[in-house]
Structures are given as structure tokens and as C-alpha cells.
Curated annotation (Swiss-Prot), chains A, B:
It catalyses: D-sedoheptulose 7-phosphate + D-glyceraldehyde 3-phosphate = aldehydo-D-ribose 5-phosphate + D-xylulose 5-phosphate. Its EC number is 2.2.1.1. Gene3D superfamilies: 3.40.50.920, 3.40.50.970. Homodimer. Binds 1 Mg(2+) ion per subunit. Can also utilize other divalent metal cations, such as Ca(2+), Mn(2+) and Co(2+). The active site is at 417 (proton donor). The record marks 30, 262 as: Important for catalytic activity. Thiamine diphosphate binds at residues 69, 116-118, 158, 187, 262, 417, 444. The keyword Magnesium applies. Its cofactor is Mg(2+); Ca(2+); Mn(2+); Co(2+). This is Transketolase. InterPro entries: THDP-binding, Transketo_C/PFOR_II, Transketolase-like_C_2, Transketolase-like_Pyr-bd, Transketolase_bac-like, Transketolase_BS, Transketolase_CS, Transketolase_fam.
Length: 679, 679
């Protein structure tokens, strides 16, 4: 006998029609997928552990809509399941300033991650599942199961075609993340028409190859029992599960099964016949029968609120039983670092030896790794180059492999930069103050552009340990030497882009990156050794930019970053011999500097002083802070690092020559600070 | 009985040792993969159709080293097979300015594509296979088989982990590209150690799921016959083939099978024992026994040169038999467009109606598609949005699907932007003047950053039709609205980044992009309608920037792009009412403008005139041409396009206000053109 009755079917129809009404009201949006996916949504959400009054509850189940364009479905669910989402909000679907934007946005209660760019959501979900497994392995104790939640995902063909989902899914299979259950909306339709124009692979077989459990629900349009049965079976698996759900896009619509229902509102007539078909009044919109509210209230909301209460009590008992761990959990849930953690950060003096900044980064990570259990690090298969693995770290691995366990905090991401970026976003979105970091070469952070952008947009404070940050990497040549990379990332809003010049600046970069709760950071680090600079300090560098070395009445300021700062210091000596007085400014992070007071910024770059920037990367973007720029607006070259620097004249003499020309150029001219702008 | 003898084994050892000697001489590089892959390289290259004296021969077989770090192997092969690569060149491996850089570079004879960034090579190879299939289907006639070449690929675990290779491989399976044969170096090692730390999926099963033929050679280290047998079997398949080749990384070395031989030179002792093991003098380096030269000369080089001769004769006969097609082939091989093709390009006057620039792009493509058979277009599943499919185009599809055929010139890429980018590079690298273009939303070109960068670095003139180019796309919201995107791409050397303002500028963008043989282009196009502007013309717009509307003695210049140019024109009217005289400059492409004479550039942006830039994207990079910038240095918002423009004040009044402040700011100040620089 079915566990589902007419009231369940009414609920499914309600979800469907609420979604259709939103799209019609906006005259914009995607009605097709919600119509096909409502039954699965009903089955999943009805049994989910959630508390709409406390959407941040750490032991909630999570639901990720990887096909984010189907957001009218998600908003309908949020309304029906008691979240802060009114019928009025639904009526303002896709309106400017509404709580129902065109794709789900992370800051809305009940929205677990921002989705829309395809392939990201499923990859975020892998990150959430990793975080849950780590949290559980770290804190659960017999009789104190603090964490046992699931992550559910909806994804469509588009998500499956994107490489980022392939990367993340392959890793999820390796990691045997049994807390991850994904529903693949097998509706055979994409924007270009029938999926067979571009995609006839055997998805189930591919996911089996990744090591996933794969199930199939043949009638996703109607068969609630089959969906429920698959869900129960998935929970029994010791692996992540993909449930292939064969559905009809736009189910019930006159154009059901065609791509015309994918991304455009249904015609008025169509909406009417749909309502009649589902037993609703065709003249009414945004209708929720009281029985449906009652159903979900009883099935899900009340039990969820109760479960949250019991969990709170469990946590209190846990704190009593395991005071140290309990305090740590409470601290992490409050989003605070342990008191005095910064004392672990190293500082340097000019007497200390020259060290590659990737190595300096390793020292920071080594020093704080034990103090900050929320650090969950890794590398995209460049561990010995990125130096991202803290001494004594345990790998995050399924215990069965014998290579580590789930309490381990070092992830072997494989050569999967984009997947790593999206997974880090998911780890961060899980909560519990998780701070993911991941290593690769700076040039290959670009492979993950799609995920980096979403970190910034959503405010996930993930950290990229981006080593080999210039032509200084040498022989690997132009395919590996970043040129445009920092210009690209500096143009992304809400993103720190650090390029520290020495030990103190590396410490500053991590200090700011870790302290900030809503801004991701890319830390660009050198392969080659860098001297510890006279004039640098953590206190100054956390400002993002500061006067490293000064002179009375400078003839010019040379502003630089990373490996070129030390060369600029040498250039100042060459200039001094010619009686040209140069102020040296180090500007390790534009974003942090931009947050300082105008007064402070002007003290660094005042009117009257010509400014020359020096950075061995594209000059684009530098005129925000400089009048003249010495950079590399061409691709690099393969050769020994110092030889390549020499070739492009990034030497004390090469800088001094350009500085001289800069001084000459501005002689007798009025020099306005680039910080003084018209509006 | 084996077809291979001692001389073959000597040749394999020679390849191995030449690679090891290169890495040792450079004291930098990757000896491991060449040692494992030399036997397969020997078997493949020995039977390849190639002419080292004419590396551009269109009917050559192609070899792509997707694991580009193994380039010492490729350079050894190029030397042994008679290409312009001397022993002296090998001795300068990884030296600045040498012909043997740290990763293979496209411009070197015999190097088919630039590789190194993992996952790209195999995806490029898919593009080459597409181009070959198209070329053959278009021009082959009974008894005139102009094109029947294969593309061979080496790839490693790293390439297989990258999402871009998943995208391209899935599409290759769908397209049934039987001319593509890939050898997967199953050596179980990556930089992080044993592959099982991150990658235990069943690769063979995955490729079967994609629709590939999958074969396995169990002993890739020694078993030349098994390799050869697999190769022959692959040629019989009607699908692309993946040959899993189990090898030992660093075969023969004391550390064979460990990751220590992956990316660092072998120790001197190790090299010596290796030479002894292979029967070479341990005290000598860069040794090639004459028998090995003789072997390859006889097996491959002489037959290849002869085959090229016969092919030349075949083409001559073809021209006689099929004069029109023959002339077309000759024209394409010469890399020239048909005389007068530009006459098909549309022009507009201000009386023509306002049209979205994506639609204007469609008109251009429609107009030239039949004239230019080298155009091979497509979209990443956004055909109805990108408007990339010319009327009457046939889809490039395996005939068996009934959806098109191989002579079709429209590719359904699926939601695979990165794969599309890499495939386009491969299509271009195939030769025959192929001009691939691909559509997606501008924001999602970023997913393909890794491939875009390689287009620019290698000089593949691919075209991105990048629609929905700003917040003007409206309701889809900030996940789809580009902000940093143009700043990113403008910072890449050798890349045109067009953002045309009207019909004439769209024509200019295509004209320049198509005419240029070594520079890729991104053409950013609006979703919303744009007016045909007074003052625009194709002749002016091809310069990349020009004065659209002028006044006598301007108080300021407003420079803008795309959809904002029309608004700036309206702003000028608002300003005129306040007696502020504004010159309006349209700057559709920084790259083309930068190639004009300094004199011309200064005529647009002279000293003495303050310049305000207006573009509804990140301001970063604009100070190259402007003193003040009005842009959007934050993420966008979901809402109707016009409402979002209003919100951010990109209106005539919003621009006029900032223009007024700009004029005010510079009153009494000396204004130097940003084009006048110190060096």
C-alpha cells in the first residue's frame, strides 16, 4: 500500500502551480523543470530534517538546487515549509530587490548555495558532504551523534555536461561520501532541443565508474512511492548515490516534453488548462490549500523544530561530557576563532634569510593548523609544489582506503582545480566556521574562474594558495606563467588578491584572509626565494598597502608587489646614486588597501608625487594607484627564472631606468594622486 | 612472429635516453613519462603519415602530447623523425630562446598544439578530429580521398581528472569520431604520489559510457606487438578509441614506479645505470645510433615524403576534375578568404531600427556563412539565445543519428564551455583555414578561461560569440551578469575583446576578427535592442576606437562601449543644455585601437581634454584610456534590464552628472592624455 494519499498529490500540484504562477507573474523564468521535479521535491522535503525558524542549524539536512534556473520550485518549497518567504514574495519573482531573484542567492534563508551557473551546485554539495563527514568524524561520540545530516541535490543534464561536476563527482566517488544523494532530472531536454543532439552518453554507467551507487526511478512524474523507495535505498548505501529520475519537462503543460517549456512562461491558456487538470480553479493564482500547509507542518516543520530542540539539549549534554571538544563546537558554531590564535603567526626581521613565499606560506599553515580545526586544506595534486600540507596532517580519506580517515583535514583533490574551487565553496557553506584552502599554481586558478566568482558573490571566505606566481617560475614557460591573472581577479568585487613580498606580508595575508568572514582570498606566492625586507611589518601589511621605505620629499614613489618589491628596493639604491629620491610602497592587496581611510591612502599616494608601478604581470588595472606602469603585457618565456627576469628587464637597473623617465616626464607638470577622483 | 626486432628495441631505448639526457642537461624537467611512453611513441610514429619537410601538409597524421610536461619525449621524436630539431637543440632543452621550451609550443614545426595545462591537448585533439571529419565529408570524392588522417593523443591521469577533458570526450563519443585514437598512460602516479589518493574511478568504464571503444595494453613498457595490435584494432572501430596503456613511470630508472621520477632529473648514477641497462655507453650523452636514423628514415620519413608527393598530384587531379571545389581547397590551404567576401557584410544608417547586437551578429553570420565554408560554428547549448546558427545550416552530426552529417557546419556543443574553447583551438590548429566560432553568455566564457588563454598564446583565431553581455540581461541576475569579464580578457595579450555599439560596429568586429589570422576574438553582444548610431561606420569602427560625435573644443570626452554608447549620446544632449560640450568616443576594441598609430590615437584622446569612461562593468583597466571611470565595481542584481540600469544610474542623467563632475574636477588643472606616457 502506498504511503502517499490524495493530499500528497494535492501538495505536489500546489508546488507545481506555485512555480508556474511565479513565472507567469514575472513573465520571465523557467517553468519546465519545476513541473517535472515537484514530485521528487515533495518526497524529499517531506522527510527532510529542517527547522525553518533556524535555517542555520548545523545538523539540518541540506537541499541544493544545482539546476538553479528552476528556482521557482525552490521558492515554492521555502514558502510551503515555513521559511521567511511569503506569497507576496513569490508574486515578486524576479523583481528588482525581491527575495525571489532569478537564480537562488546564498544570503536568502533556506537557500544553501547560490546556483545558476551550471555544474556548481552538485560540486558545492560534494563540499557540504565532505564538511559533514569531517564534522561528524571529529565531534561525534557514542550516544552523542552531533552530526548525521544528508545533502540532497537536484541536477539536470546541463550540470552533468559541465566539467566541474565531473571533477567533483569523481572525487566524491573516491571519497565514498554516503551522505550525498543526488537526483538527476532525466528529462531529455536542453535549450538546444532534445538532449540527443549533444549528449547521449550513459550517465548511469559513468557514475558507476566514479564509484557511485546508481538507481533509476522510471516515472518521476507520478510515482511517489518509487521515489521514496529509491531515497531509502540510497540511505543504505556506503557510497554517494545518483538517482536517475526520468521526468517530463513541463509535465501537464500543453507543450510538455518540449524545450519550449524550458525557459519561457507558459501561455495563459496553457496555465488555465494546467490548473483544471490539477483540480485547481483556473481563475485563481498563488493558491495553497490549507491541507497542504497542514500536511507539511505536521510531517516536517513541527518534527524539525522538535529535532532542533533535542539537538540543542544533546549539545548541552555533550559540552558537559566533553568540555574541551564541546567548547570547540560552540566556538565554531559562533563563527569565532580561538582567543589568541594570531600569536601562532610568525614574524620576521631583515636579518632572517631569504625564503620563497610559498615556503613562508607553509610555515604559517604549519603554525596555525592545529590551533584552527576548522582549516580544511588541500591541493589540486601539487602538494610538494604548493607546500600546503601541514606537518602531521592526516589525509581526509575513507578509512577503508587505509590512507587516512574522515577526521583528516587534508584533501587530495587530484588535478581538478574547478572542482576544488566549487567544493571549497560547499565546505564553507556547510557552516561550523569551516575555512577551506586549496593549492594550485596561480595560473591554474583561472581554470576555476567560475567557482572563484561565486565565492566572491556569495561571500565564502575560501583561500587559494596560488604558488608559482610569475615568470619567476622559470622553465615551465608561458603555459604556466601568469600574465593576466591578477588583473582578472582584482576586477572581481569582494575578493582579496594578495601578492606578499616577504614573511611579514605572508603572515598579514593569512591574518586578514582568515579574519574576514565574507571575503575570499587568493594568495599569490613565489617559487623563488625573497629577502625579508627592511620596513615591512605585519601591522603595516594588513592594511593592504604601506610605505615600506621612505625618503624626505620623494621625487617619485615606486609601488610594487611580491617578488618585485625587493628589486624595487635595489632600484632605489641605483636611483639614489643619481640623486633621485624614491619612496618604496608595497601594495600586497588592492582590496584591503581600498578599505582604508582616504586619508591613509593619500598619505601613501599623495598629490605631487609621480607613482610608478612595478609588477611582472599585465599592467591593466594598475592605474588605479599609479601614473605609469612597468609590467609584462605579453606572454612569458621558458628559461631559468633569473634569465627570464633579465630578459624582460625586471632588474634594479631596468626599474631605475623607467623611474628616471617617470621623474623626467612629470617635471614641471602638475601631479594629481590617482586617489583623487572627480566623483 | 613479432614484426619488431632488436633494432626497434634500440630505437625505443634511444628515444628514452634522448629524453633523459635533455632533462639532465637542463637539470629541470620530467623524465618519468618519456621513459614509460617511448615504446608506444615508437609504434605510433613509425606508422604515422608525416612529412618532416612539410609539417603543414593537411593530410598528415597528427600527434598531440596532452601531457605536455613529457615534451622531452616529443622533442626526441621530432629529431629522430627528421624535423627541424637538431641534437644541439635538444642540448638546450628548457633554455631561454631555445627550440625546446619547457612545454611544447605551437609555433615549433611538428608541434601540433601548445600543451602543458592539463586536459587541453586531448580536447584540442577532439577539435582536430572534428575538422578532419568535416574536411573529408566536404571535399572527398570517390577515388579522390583528399583527407583520411588520424589524430593520435597521449594523455595521463592528470588530463583525465580535468573537467575540460570530460566535456570534450563526452562530445567526441557522441560525435563518433573514429579518426581519434588516444593512449592513456596508466602509470598510477601523479605529483601527490600514488594515483589512488584521489583517483580510483574506472576510467575504461567511463569512456565506454561516453561511447568510446576502449582497449587495454597490459604491458606498455615492452610489448610493442600488443601496442601495435591495439592500434590496428582502434582503426577498425567506428568510434573514438581510448587505449589504456599500463606503464611504469620512469621505466628502467632506480626509482621506476615512484613519483620521484615524475618531475625532477634523474641522479647521475641513475642515468648511468640506465644507459648500461639499455646497452649504451654510460659516459656518452645524446647518442643516436645510425641504425635508428636509418630505421625511421625507411619506415616513415621516405614513405611520408612520397605520400605527400602523391597527395599533391591527387590534389592537382582533383582540381581538374572538380574545378570549383578544387579552387576552394587551394584557397583554403593558402589561408585566404574568397575575393570580395566582405561585400556580404551588412551596413546600417541611423534610420535603421534598433536591434539587439546578438541579433546583428546573427545577421552577419547568416550573410557570410555560405560564402565562407571554413566557418565551423556552434553554441554551448544556447543556440536560441546566442543566435549563432545560420539559417539553413546543417548540424555537424554522425549521419547515423539522422540529425545531420559530417559536412554540417553547426556543432551542438552541449553545456560545455571549456570543452568548446579547447575544441575550437583544435579545429583552428587542424589548418585548412578553419575558423571556429562558438556561442555562450559572456559570463560563461570565463568557464573556458584556460582555453581562451591558450587561443591567445598560440594565436588560434577563434571567435567567441558572447551574448548577454551585461546587467542588461536582466532577470537572470548576478550569477549571469558579467562584471570582471572584460577586464579579465582585455588583460590577456593577443586577444581582441569587442563590445560593439550598433550594427556597423558588429560588422567591424567580425570583419577584423575574421581577417586576423593569429588573434582570437571575444565579441560581447547585448540581449537588449541598441539604436543605430549617428556617426558610426564600419571603416571607423575597424580601428577599434573612434570619435563618434564631436564638438568644437570639447570640455570633455566620454568614451564608452556597446550598449552604453547610445546612452552616452543622450547624456551629451543633457550636457549641451548646460553648455558642456562632450565629444563621444566609441571604443569597441582596445586591442585594435592599440594597434593604430600613436598619432591617430592622440587625435581621439588629445592632451587637454578630460576623458570619462562609461561601461556598465568593472572599471579596472579603463584608465589606460580615461582619466575618470563610471562603471560597476560590484555584482549586479536580478530585475528587468531597464530597472537594473536605472538602479545603477546608467542613464543619460546619471552619466551627465558624472561628466559634469569630471569637467569641474579638471578645471584649471593640466590634463595629460593617458596615451602620453613616460616610457
Amino acid at each position: 500500500m502506498s504511503q502517499y494519499t490524495d493530499i500528497d498529490r494535492l501538495a505536489v500540484s500546489t508546488i507545481r502551480l506555485l512555480a508556474v504562477d511565479q513565472v507567469s507573474a514575472a513573465n520571465s523564468g523557467h517553468p519546465g523543470a519545476p513541473l517535472g521535479l515537484a514530485p521528487a521535491a515533495h518526497v524529499i522535503w517531506k522527510q527532510m530534517r529542517l527547522n525553518p525558524k533556524n535555517p542555520e542549524w548545523i545538523n539540518r539536512d541540506r537541499f541544493v538546487l544545482s539546476n538553479g534556473h528552476a528556482c521557482a520550485l525552490l521558492y515554492s518549497l521555502l514558502h510551503l515549509f515555513g521559511y521567511d518567504m511569503s506569497i507576496e514574495d513569490l508574486k515578486h519573482f524576479r523583481h528588482l530587490g525581491s527575495k525571489t531573484p532569478g537564480h537562488p542567492e546564498f544570503e536568502l534563508p533556506g537557500v544553501e548555495v547560490t546556483t545558476g551557473p551550471l555544474g556548481q551546485g552538485i560540486s558545492n554539495a560534494v563540499g557540504m558532504a565532505i564538511a559533514q563527514a569531517n564534522f561528524a568524524a571529529t565531534y561525534n561520540k557514542p550516544d552523542y551523534e552531533l552530526s548525521d545530516s544528508y545533502t540532497y541535490v537536484f541536477l539536470g543534464d546541463g550540470c552533468l555536461q559541465e566539467g566541474v561536476s565531473s571533477e567533483a563527482s569523481s572525487l566524491a566517488g573516491h571519497l565514498r561520501l554516503k551522505n550525498l544523494i543526488a537526483f538527476y532530472d532525466d528529462n531529455q531536454i536542453t535549450i538546444d532541443g532534445n538532449i540527443n543532439v549533444s549528449f547521449d552518453e550513459d550517465v548511469s554507467k559513468r557514475y558507476e565508474a566514479y564509484g557511485w551507487e546508481v538507481l533509476h526511478v522510471e516515472n518521476g512524474n507520478d510515482d511517489l512511492d518509487a521515489i521514496s523507495k529509491a531515497l531509502e535505498q540510497a540511505k543504505l548505501s556506503d557510497r554517494p548515490t545518483l538517482i536517475k529520475l526520468t521526468t517530463t519537462i513541463g509535465f501537464g503543460s500543453l507543450n510538455a516534453g518540449s524545450h519550449s517549456v524550458h525557459g519561457a512562461p507558459l501561455k495563459a491558456d496553457d496555465v488555465k488548462q494546467l490548473k483544471v487538470k490539477f483540480g485547481f480553479n483556473p481563475e485563481e493564482s498563488f493558491v495553497v490549500p490549507q491541507e497542504v500547509y497542514d500536511l507539511y507542518n505536521k510531517s516536517t516543520i513541527e518534527p524539525g523544530i522538535e529535532a532542533n530542540k533535542q539537538w540543542d539539549a544533546l549539545l548541552d549534554a555533550y559540552v558537559g561530557q566533553f568540555p574541551e571538544l564541546g567548547a570547540e563546537v560552540k566556538r565554531r558554531l559562533a563563527g569565532e576563532f580561538p582567543e589568541g590564535w594570531e600569536s601562532k603567526l610568525p614574524t620576521y626581521t631583515p636579518e632572517d634569510s631569504a625564503v620563497a613565499s610559498r615556503k613562508l606560506s607553509e610555515i604559517v599553515l604549519d603554525n596555525v593548523f592545529d590551533t584552527l580545526p576548522e582549516l580544511l586544506g588541500g591541493s589540486a595534486d601539487l602538494t610538494p609544489s604548493n607546500l600546503t600540507r601541514s606537518k602531521g596532517a592526516v589525509d581526509f580519506q575513507p578509512p577503508i582506503t587505509g590512507l587516512g580517515d574522515y577526521s583528516g583535514r587534508y584533501i587530495r583533490y587530484g588535478v581538478r582545480e574547478h572542482g576544488m574551487g566549487a567544493i571549497m565553496n560547499g565546505i564553507s557553506a556547510f557552516g561550523a566556521n569551516y575555512r577551506p584552502y586549496g593549492g594550485t599554481f596561480l595560473n591554474f586558478v583561472s581554470y576555476a574562474s567560475g567557482a572563484v566568482r561565486l565565492s566572491a558573490l556569495s561571500g565564502h571566505p575560501v583561500i587559494w594558495v596560488a604558488t608559482h606566481d610569475s615568470i619567476g617560475l622559470g622553465e615551465d614557460g608561458p603555459t604556466h606563467q601568469p600574465i593576466e591573472t591578477l588583473a582578472h581577479f582584482r576586477a572581481i568585487p569582494n575578493l582579496q588578491v594578495w601578492r606578499p613580498a616577504d614573511g611579514n606580508e605572508v603572515t598579514a595575508a593569512y591574518k586578514v584572509a582568515l579574519t574576514n568572514k565574507h571575503t575570499p582570498a587568493i594568495i599569490a606566492l613565489s617559487r623563488q626565494n625573497l629577502p625579508q625586507l627592511q620596513g615591512s611589518s605585519v601591522e603595516k601589511a594588513v592594511k593592504g598597502g604601506y610605505i615600506l621605505q621612505d625618503v624626505d620629499q620623494p621625487d617619485l614613489a615606486i609601488v610594487s608587489t611580491g617578488s618585485e618589491v625587493g628589486i624595487a628596493v635595489e632600484a632605489a639604491k641605483v636611483l639614489a646614486e643619481k640623486n633621485i629620491k624614491a619612496r618604496i610602497v608595497s601594495l600586497p592587496d588592492f582590496h584591503s588597501f581600498g578599505q582604508q581611510s582616504k586619508e591613509y591612502q593619500l598619505s601613501v599616494f599623495p598629490d605631487g608625487v609621480p607613482i610608478l608601478s612595478v609588477e611582472v604581470l599585465a599592467t591593466s588595472g594598475w592605474s588605479k594607484y599609479a601614473h605609469q606602469s612597468f609590467g609584462l603585457d605579453r606572454f612569458g618565456a621558458s628559461g631559468k627564472g633569473p634569465a627570464v627576469y633579465e630578459k624582460f628587464e625586471f632588474t634594479p637597473q631596468g626599474i631605475a631606468t623607467r623611474a628616471e623617465k617617470t621623474v623626467e616626464f612629470y617635471k614641471g607638470k602638475q601631479v594629481i594622486s590617482p586617489l583623487n577622483t572627480a566623483f
